[in-house]
Amino acid sequence: VIDIRNWLKECGSPEGEVEIIAKIESRAGVNNIDEILEASDGIMVARGDLGVEIPFEEVPNIQKTIIHKCRIQGKRSITATEMLESMIKNPRPTRAEISDVANAVYDGSSAIMLSGETAAGEHPVEAVKAMAKIAEQAEKNTQYINYIKPEDYHIKNLSEALSHSACTLAQDIGAKLIVACTRSGYTAKLVSRFRPMIDIIGMTTDERAYRKLALSWGVIPVMSEEFSSVDVLFHFGKCAAIATGLVKKGDKIVLTGGKPNGKSGNANLISVETI
């Protein structure tokens, strides 16, 4: 991972522009997960390969451990391979596959991924629809947020403290949405780390950041025009919240972000607005 980062730097790629997802598929990867996670932007748990490289009965615990570590570090986690394997040939998933997908959601995965089902399967569209339905239903479980809410995180800087405060404030006042106004996507990812019980809007002016945010847990990416002041920033944030259809007149929202001309990644503002 470090070699890839050095190569990207040599090629002139700005730091953070290209994110690296490390695929864990061997005992060596599992044994060195902390170091790999520190160097990466996220982890893919490749259960199919893991089940070949290590005893298959260990895979579920390894999956849960890796996802938990990702949540604590605020890194993305992707659970992948053989999730709806039977749908390569069949139009419906098995009951075991349905439970597998749901449990990956309960574990707190940032994303769940299909591979052979859509790459070479006979029912690719049905597989995507089935996985989406299972994930949406799993998230409706009233205990879902309790399963995945990290308790042992460590606040390292002002941006993390502000993002945590935004989540706590939103819960205390009964806000319907958190709007993270972000240029690079960093602020939205920090808010996502704390797994708030409400949706997060990641509002950005950067198309690359917009695409990346689709992989962050609970984040709805929204493109915005450039903003020249804090007032304009928060006005656009309210407009973005209304455009999603998730709020109505009288609802409260929490907005967080940084000064328009400030350094990327240095969120230092928080506000409560009423629609």
Question: Each PLM stretch: what is its role?
Answer:
Residues V1-I275:
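Non-catalytic helical/linker scaffolds that mediate oligomerization, partner binding
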